[in-house]
Amino acid sequence: MNSLFASTARGLEELLKIELEKLGAVGCQVVQGGVHFQGDTRLIYQSLMWSRLASRIILPMGECKVYSDLDLYFGVQAINWTEIFNPGATFAVHFSGLNDTIRNSQYGAMKVKDAIVDAFTRKNLPRPNVDRESPDLRINVWLNKETASIALDLSGDGLHLRGYRDRTGLAPIKETLAAAIVMRSGWQPGTPLLDPMCGSGTLLIEAAMWATDRAPGLHRGHWGFSGWAQHDEAIWQEVKAEAQTRARKGLAEYSSHFYGSDSDARVIERARSNARRAGIGELITFEVKDVAQLSNPLPKGPYGTVISNPPYGERLDSDPALIALHSLLGRTMKNQFGGWNLSLFSASPDLLGSLQLRADKQFKAKNGPLDCVQKNYHIAETTADSKPATVAEDYANRLRKNLKKLEKWARQEGIECYRLYDADLPEYNVAVDRYGDWAVIQEYAPPKTVDAQKARQRLFDIIAATLSVLGIPPNKLVLKTRERQKGKNQYQKMSEKGEFLEVSEYNARLWVNLTDYLDTGLFLDHRIARRMLGEMSKGKDFLNLFSYTGSASVHAGLGGARNTTTVDMSRTYLEWAERNLRLNGLSGRAHRLIQADCLGWLREANEQFDLIFIDPPTFSNSKRMEESFDVQRDHVALMKDLKRLLRKGGTIMFSNNKRGFRMDLEGLAELGLTAQEITQKTLSPDFARNRQIHNCWLIRAA
């Protein structure tokens, strides 16, 4: 009997143990990453040929203590390699692990190689050659602290390489993991199996090979035992012949069918080629179509299983499309696949929540470095009076109601950008803004006391409901997370897409960027204030301080201002403002753009203006500013500087976003200024619920 080890992906060890025992293995012991077992020579070949789950079959050769590189050298040389190698066999060494002595795996591999070669030369035997690409023997050495374990890898290449897959195409899951997913799915061979996002067809091919009793090793052309002196070719040929006989019989007797589809025609062609090479091409129908076109291929029965490894995203901006995909799949399953089972393998359990289905079973496994989950669902049979479930129904109803009211109003006003929803319902704490045929969802970051997974699931529900109510494609929905603003956070860059969208606001055309920054370049709540500035600007000299992207300057220019001066500290936003002005035919000396610290520029300027708009930050202590600024504390001093630039009979429009802001009327009076609050006049219907979104004042000389 040989002591052997079968390695596998994390999470599949128990499944592998059952498989090995069915093959005849004894003494099976599960450890992390594999199973120790015992078996004769025939079992070695049986496990190599028939294991669908093992990554490699390893034959341990010995262990040694390693306190120096000489310990490793002599420990390896103590093994009788001349009884392991066939004459003329090539080899390669794979070394993993480090300790205080062996600090480089390449150095460790070199010492092992030297020890093996010297074992031959000392006996005056021809030295074996190294072949790193396709060796006859693979020697594996694992160094754990001071212990080196030396073994012969009888697999050669990993057992997931069945021989049917085109190696030029990347596979998101290995064949061994795919086989485990099929086994855990609850699917019964002989019943239909469908993968609506099949990619190169790995899940379906593994299922078909299992169902037709086709050994996973039948199509492999190279093994790790070809140069092994104890290899028994006669037994191997018996095992191989048996596998071929069973495969022919299994294919001839199998009567059910497999169905695969994908939106990418290239991967579907690759899937067809893979299935043909695997010998089961006639059993699988592959089609080019996306999930939106998914339909039950057997509406009158029998019931089957839908299985898939759907895509997942690592970035938040990919979520809308993926959430829509999962939501659509869930609805399609309920509408067309009543009585069927569904099994999905995913690295994103939260996305599976978008199915709006309750899982009966779930399993955990590793896909490379990724923690993954497989969830199995049974789809209830539908009845004539069954009503489809609505995702986030309260939120969807409110959004639908707001849309009906605001869409008509916006069209009459001549605006394309407006707020549709602003945390109307406390449990759905987001803002939804419309920008033409785009939508932006801003999630207000939940407090730390809220369960993060529940909050993420609710956000996914919001995205699915928003896409459904607005009827927009997922690629026109942008998702952002907004935290309480401090200093100039709103100006920090989030992305590098550089994609601008032209929108209309009354008679102005403006550029917005929905992805690269937390804000889009257009403060929607100031829309009416900008229109008022346009109406007040005719024939006047206009100053715009803390100008952001210059949209107020655009309205002033279109309103007939004699000239506009736009001041901001950010070169990025000044360039954006220049683009906005040019878009409206406003350019030349009459429309100046100045990059400067606004407070410093204000103290040094000696020009006069008829109309000044200033919308300062609530608080700022930027390194590029000479001093900190607090709008509550410093607004009177600010007005003192502004008054110096204000022409007789002129007006200052002063706005800020500080909640609970209190205007110091007495302080203004001492400066000879009066203030008229116009906040309510500047609030439009889409911000009617949030009357503290900003406050706005007209300030004039007394």
UniProtKB/Swiss-Prot annotation:
Gene3D superfamilies: 3.30.2130.30, RNA methyltransferase domain (HRMD) like, Vaccinia Virus protein VP39. Keywords: Cytoplasm, Methyltransferase, RNA-binding, rRNA processing, S-adenosyl-L-methionine, Transferase. Disulfide bonds: none annotated. It is found in: Cytoplasm. It catalyses: guanosine(2445) in 23S rRNA + S-adenosyl-L-methionine = N(2)-methylguanosine(2445) in 23S rRNA + S-adenosyl-L-homocysteine + H(+); guanosine(2069) in 23S rRNA + S-adenosyl-L-methionine = N(2)-methylguanosine(2069) in 23S rRNA + S-adenosyl-L-homocysteine + H(+). Its EC number is 2.1.1.173, 2.1.1.264. InterPro entries: 23SrRNA_methyltr_KL, DNA_methylase_N6_adenine_CS, RlmKL-like_Mtase, RlmKL-like_Mtase_CS, RlmL_1st, SAM-dep_methyl-trfase, SAM-dependent_MTases_sf, THUMP_dom. One of its GO terms (molecular function) is RNA binding. GO terms for cellular component: cytoplasm. Residues 43-154 form the THUMP domain. Pfam families: Methyltrans_SAM, RlmL_1st, THUMP, UPF0020. NCBIfam families: PRK11783.1. Specifically methylates the guanine in position 2445 (m2G2445) and the guanine in position 2069 (m7G2069) of 23S rRNA. Belongs to the methyltransferase superfamily. RlmKL family. This is Ribosomal RNA large subunit methyltransferase K/L. The gene is rlmL.
